[in-house]
A protein has these predicted regions:
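N-terminal lobe of the biotin/lipoate ligase/transferase fold
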Residues: 1-107, 253
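Short beta-strand segments
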Residues: 51-53, 77, 115, 131-133, ...
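Conserved, helical-rich catalytic subdomain that frames metal- and/or nucleotide-binding sites
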Residues: 172-228, 236
Length: 265
């Protein structure tokens, strides 16, 4: 089953609150949705999702480009208005988006993990990347747009990226993009609404634990690199603000914000 790509609004069956905008091609689904939020006469409804058959300038973390063969993968962005989330706690949004992708892919194969902060891996290979863009309103998150690219049916990757993999390469089967999108949106919606109702913070704590359990290279010593060079360390923790905590061979704890440390793959 393939998408019929047109620039129009539809809805996912049985989920009328999830409007879908399907595009044949765009430079970036994140940029398209952000422009829609900023310039449309009325802001798009929460959960509005833009999906493209092809992106000409898809971006991931660290400014990396995202290679995707037209029509072979799942490329989309969705919008949330999580004004109930304090800016200092915004990492929880990255956690629930990452978990929703991971758990949807878990239904198709084993070995799926989350590479901090939010890449999705199958063993040592990258199957999904995302770019989450937040807009602040005072000390709250006024808008969150996660942009996600999942490698589904592409079997040849020509970019210099070191370790891409698709679901088809893993299992040998073709996959239906609307089915996987629907599954992701349902999972994200469940997490998001539970977070909205989380008055005592217990749900956020449970999410942090689930996220930690799902992390790539959760056990053992592994190579990393920071501004001072390469070193071996084990994963110790991820703090509520998203800081990555490693324990090196000497037992010293090292804390990093995003882009301050890299995995050596």
């Amino acid at each position: 089953m393939n998408f019929t790509y047109k620039t129009k609004m539809t809805t996912i069956p049985e989920q009328p609150s999830f409007p879908i905008i399907r595009l044949e091609e765009t430079d970036s689904t994140n940029r398209y949705l952000s422009d829609l939020c900023d310039n449309a006469p009325a802001a798009p409804a929460e959960n509005t999702t833009v999906i493209a058959r092809f992106q000409t300038s898809g971006k991931g973390q660290r400014g990396n480009s995202w290679e995707s063969e037209a029509g072979q993968n799942l490329l989309f962005s969705t919008v949330l208005y999580p004004r109930f989330v304090e800016a200092r706690r915004q990492f929880v949004l990255s956690q629930i988006v990452s978990l929703a992708v991971k758990e949807e892919l878990d239904t198709y194969t084993e070995g799926i993990t989350i590479k901090w902060p939010n890449d999705i891996y199958w063993h040592e290979k990258k199957i999904c990347g995302m770019l989450i863009e937040n807009v602040l309103e005072g000390n709250r998150i006024g808008r969150c747009i996660p942009g996600i690219g999942i490698n589904l049916n592409q079997t040849v990757f020509r970019s210099p990226a070191p370790n891409p993999v698709s679901l088809k390469q893993i299992t040998g089967r073709d996959y239906d993009a609307p089915t996987i999108l629907n599954g992701f949106l349902r999972r994200l919606h469940t997490y998001y609404e539970a977070l909205r109702r989380d008055e005592d913070g217990r749900f956020a704590i449970s999410i942090a634990r689930r996220y930690a359990d799902a992390l790539f290279r959760r056990e053992g010593l592994h190579p990393y690199e920071d501004a001072n060079g390469r070193f071996l360390a084990r994963l110790a923790d991820v703090e509520p603000d998203g800081r990555f905590v490693l324990q090196d061979e000497a037992g010293r704890l090292r804390k990093y914000l995003f882009k301050e440390v890299q995995y050596i793959l």
